[in-house]
Amino acid sequence: MLVDDIRWQRCDIKSTSLLGNVLQMNDAKSAGCNEILMHKNGELTEGGASNIFFVKNKTIFTPELSSNILPGITRHQVIKIINDKKLNFEEGSYGIDDLKEASSIWFT
């Protein structure tokens, strides 16, 4: 379920103030969805309790770390494996439309 990222501006800080995530995840579950994909003004941020990766043209992409993204432990490990395997990988700023061309999308 695609939702506006309504959280406070320092999402990179893990805190007990995850009410925005919880409320939107509850809405998603009520709508029959397992996860939400948040964005700010069309720019991908992260899932409700996860980071997002996608593949397009044989390259793996994930949004770069910013104040809108919590640097998850699993995200870090996935990036380490990608680099160890020398796979094509880019961190950057990606929009909702980038996912329309993706061959696969996953949350960590």
Predicted regions, residues:
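Helix-start/capping segments and mature chain N-termini
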Residues: 1-108
